Amino acid sequence: MVNLVCDAIIPDGPMKDVEEIEKSILTTYKKSIWSKFLKAINDFDMIQDGDKIAIGVSGGKDSLLLVKLFQELKKDRRKKFDFKAVSLNPGFRHSDLDNFKNNLDKLNIECEIIDTNIWEIANEKAKDYPCFLCAKMRRGILYTQVEELGFNKLTLGHHFDDVIETTLINMFYAGTMKTMTPKVPSTSGKLELIRPLIYVKEADIIDYTKTNGIRAMNCGCTIEAGKTSSKRREVKDLLAALEEKNPGIKQSVFNSMKNINLDYVFGYTGGKEVE
């Protein structure tokens, strides 16, 4: 049976002091998180001097970590850039929103929260499957707001496992070879989307979150009550089973997106449909 419920991350204890959390990034998680974050930025030339970067913050484990990493990067001063955390409130419950704001306060994160009624609209217009419309609306509003605020880049918290799962979802269910790229222009062309966590494994993000006592938002959706995509869950469970029997499977899938031999595929469409 496929588990359709988002896995809750239960902290090991109360949240640690922000100074201790920040120190852990450069000590305990230097190899598994910090170094991989820096490597992705350098490998894909994600940040240039003068950049104005918005960090999309959902309140979940990935985006909360991402902001802390950028705070540490800013201290380095080798790259001259500005950044700001930006979050959409699609209609969170008061308790979830309060927890989110409490996390921001304790983690010393300044974040602009933009209130919307996305969930209400998505549920009214697409009752059977509101998730697709919700995601589309959230992207559209976030991109527009970030552009209007004068940013030229938007940072998203997608990690190593997101890349692998997306690759297989596209293969299994859409019949296409496509994945999340480290950086890509937005549809309007006014923004560049960057993913500095692309080398960071979800298990390490979970460990960082639990160990530091961060009660990150799990799934604040008031409509689907914690359910996640059945396709993504199927792929996640499949990968876990394969990785247990054959350690390195995930890395191989990830590497495959960097090693496509066009001489040995049926056709290359360049984003266009094959006739």
Residue spans of the language-model regions?
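Alpha-helix boundary/capping detector
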Residues: 96, 130, 168, 172, ...
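ATP-dependent adenylation/nucleotidyltransferase module used to activate substrates
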Residues: 2-167, 173-182, 203-211
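A general structural signal for short secondary-structure boundary/capping elements
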Residues: 131-136, 158, 199-203, 242-245, ...
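Residues that form or immediately flank small-molecule/cofactor binding pockets and catalytic motifs
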Residues: 90, 116-118, 198, 221, ...
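Catalytic subdomain that performs nucleotidyl-dependent activation
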Residues: 82-83, 161-241
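The feature marks non-catalytic terminal segments
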Residues: 214-275
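Short, basic, helix/turn surface patches
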Residues: 136-149, 183-189, 239-256
